[in-house]
């Protein structure tokens, strides 16, 4: 299903490019290209609700986490005829979740914190729909996103009366896990940015191509929604 959505998005962008080309040819094209930059950069802060999905033999369970990332990207014009760009960049994302439980009768409190630190390398095809007679542009994109997990761990703190005990487990360490998670994960993404002068907001979705963890029929994959606020220069 998700692969079908990705392919449909690619087809939609190709049809949009073709339609825009015909429109520009019938209307001269020079005015549309006047506002197009050959190269532009973006820097944004992105909040991402992250879903971690575990699947086995047709059954699945999900866990929700929070993600916050700082990202840079550069877009380069691919052709003088159309505002089609190759966009590439890098970002750092911190993902976390905290669960707490307690037993008042025994005076026991348990706090578990899951954290991931991830380097992201996106590569997109982006189209710049400049709205005539305004400073607004709508820029849909579709592409791939490589994720390199630098850190991934679970920290559990148990408090009993005045005593506290802490334990940690790394998801990527063979010392802590017999079959550790994958540090490199590939995903696909689709979204759009709306810019006004040098500012923009963005909304996007990342889906999985490869799994964070896989053992036989059991696998763990992640997906996320991206809500961005940034500047262009």
Please place each PLM-identified region on the residue numbering:
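Outer-membrane beta-barrel architecture
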Residues: 69-73, 122-126, 191-193, 228-230
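Residues that define the transmembrane beta-barrel architecture of outer-membrane proteins
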Residues: 37-41, 62-68, 94, 111-121, ...
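Transmembrane beta-strands of outer-membrane beta-barrel proteins
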Residues: 39-45, 84-90, 119-121, 138-144, ...
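Bacterial Sec-dependent N-terminal signal peptides
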Residues: 1-26
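Transmembrane beta-strands of outer-membrane beta-barrel pores
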Residues: 47-53, 74, 90-98, 117, ...
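Flexible, solvent-exposed loop segments that connect beta-strands
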Residues: 49-63, 93-116, 150-182, 211-225
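Predominantly the C-terminal beta-signal and adjacent terminal strand-loop region
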Residues: 32, 93, 175-233
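Short glycine/proline- and aromatic-enriched beta-strand/turn motifs that initiate or cap beta-hairpins
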Residues: 21-77, 232
């Amino acid at each position: 299903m998700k692969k079908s959505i990705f392919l449909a998005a690619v087809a939609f962008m190709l049809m949009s490019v073709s339609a825009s080309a015909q429109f520009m040819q019938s209307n001269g094209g020079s005015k549309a290209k006047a506002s197009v930059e050959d190269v532009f950069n973006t820097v944004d802060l992105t909040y991402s609700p992250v879903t971690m999905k575990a699947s086995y033999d047709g059954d699945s369970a999900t866990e929700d986490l929070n993600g916050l990332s700082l990202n840079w990207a550069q877009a380069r014009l691919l052709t003088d005829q159309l505002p089609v760009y190759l966009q590439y960049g890098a970002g750092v994302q911190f993902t976390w979740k905290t669960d707490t439980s307690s037993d008042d009768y025994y005076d026991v409190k348990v706090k578990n914190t899951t954290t991931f630190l991830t380097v992201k390398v996106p590569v997109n095809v982006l189209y710049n729909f400049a709205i005539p007679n305004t400073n607004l542009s709508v820029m849909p994109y579709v592409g791939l996103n490589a994720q390199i997990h630098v850190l991934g761990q679970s920290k559990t703190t148990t408090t009993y009366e005045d005593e506290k005990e802490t334990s940690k487990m790394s998801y990527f360490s063979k010392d802590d896990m017999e079959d550790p998670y994958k540090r490199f994960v590939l995903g696909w993404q689709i979204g759009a940015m709306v810019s006004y002068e040098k500012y923009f907001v963005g909304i996007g979705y990342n889906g999985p191509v490869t799994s964070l963890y896989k053992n036989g029929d059991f696998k763990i994959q992640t997906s996320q929604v991206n809500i961005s606020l940034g500047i262009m220069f």
